[in-house]
From Swiss-Prot:
The name this protein goes by in its record: Mitochondrial import inner membrane translocase subunit tim13
Assembly and binders: Heterohexamer; composed of 3 copies of TIM8 and 3 copies of TIM13, named soluble 70 kDa complex. Associates with the TIM22 complex, whose core is composed of TIM22 and TIM54. Interacts with the transmembrane regions of multi-pass transmembrane proteins in transit.
GO MF assignments: metal ion binding; protein transporter activity
Organism name: Aspergillus fumigatus (strain ATCC MYA-4609 / CBS 101355 / FGSC A1100 / Af293) (Neosartorya fumigata)
Domain commentary: The twin CX3C motif contains 4 conserved Cys residues that form 2 disulfide bonds in the mitochondrial intermembrane space. However, during the transit of TIM13 from cytoplasm into mitochondrion, the Cys residues probably coordinate zinc, thereby preventing folding and allowing its transfer across mitochondrial outer membrane.
Length: 113
């Protein structure tokens, strides 16, 4: 009974939705990888310089402790800033009628290194 091709139209729009979902997931994954690389780079830059003034062949226990604490703090700050930024984006999207960000995007914005 589909004179105007309504059943095939539903199939096409379903396929387009699948493609859109796949692309959005791929972009989220790429953004998460980029964020992780940035985080690791910043942690290396800041914590290494702060905790290891004279690099040697191995880390002392004090250097190891310093690196661990610095990394934990830096990652915690990174996550706090990410949550704030994502909340701001969600509020702006709501204000402009774009809807809220879904929970999977919020979780991918945080690092659990």
């Amino acid at each position: 009974m589909a004179i105007w091709g309504s059943s095939s139209s539903n199939t096409a729009s379903s396929g387009e939705a699948d493609i859109k979902t796949h692309l959005m997931n791929q972009v989220r994954q790429e953004a998460a990888v980029t964020n992780a690389r940035n985080l690791i780079g910043k942690v290396n830059e800041h914590c290494f310089e702060a905790c290891i003034p004279n690099p040697g062949t191995s880390l002392s226990s004090a250097e190891h402790t310093c690196l661990s604490q610095c990394m934990e703090k830096y990652i915690s700050f990174w996550n706090a800033v990410s949550r704030g930024y994502i909340a701001r984006l969600a509020n702006e999207r709501k204000a402009y009628g774009g809807g809220a960000l879904d929970a999977s995007f919020v979780q991918s914005g945080e690092s659990s290194l």
